[in-house]
A protein has these predicted regions:
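Alpha-helical cap/lid subdomain in secreted, periplasmic
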Residues: 2-153
């Protein structure tokens, strides 16, 4: 929940794209799924309102909170992505989460090797097309006047 309060600081940098990965720490604490979803929606909206495209990193959690919680939690990310028209990384930690060789001793946070996999396999395939769209948009606005011009002789 702390990230929602820090978004103004993020928006001061005027990001074109923000990769948002929140909710897992709340789930570890057993925070109600509806509250987690509301916080994610608030964060996405604040970023969008600040002019940033959002890529939402989906999370999954261990089953220690029960199957109902796990299923409800997993459903948050695709639902928010669809409802708020944002790009989704289905599972941000795909290929890394749960692998002791790719995570620190806390079994939650990836190692350097784990992050390398996350970036190369999970982020870049989704981020690269978004960057290309932005580059095309910048090129279009640079070559086309934003308002009609009138010449007089």
């Amino acid at each position: 929940t702390g990230l929602v309060d820090r978004l103004d600081w993020v928006l001061q940098t005027k990001p074109d794209i923000t990769i948002l990965t929140i909710g897992a720490n709340d789930a570890i604490r057993g925070i109600d799924v509806a509250t987690v979803e509301a916080n994610i929606r608030t964060a996405v909206k604040r970023l969008q309102d600040g002019g940033s495209e959002v890529i939402l990193g989906g999370m999954q959690i261990y089953d220690n909170l029960g199957a109902d919680y796990v299923e409800s939690f997993a459903a948050i990310y695709p639902r928010v992505a669809k409802d708020m028209n944002v790009t989704l990384i289905p599972f941000f930690l795909e290929g890394v989460g749960g692998d002791p060789k790719l995570n620190q001793a806390d079994a939650i946070h990836p190692t350097k090797e784990g992050y390398t996999i996350i970036v190369n396999d999970n982020i870049l395939p989704i981020l690269q097309p978004e960057i290309e769209k932005l580059e095309a948009a910048y090129t279009d606005t640079a070559t086309k006047p934003s308002t009609p011009t009138e010449t007089t002789q």
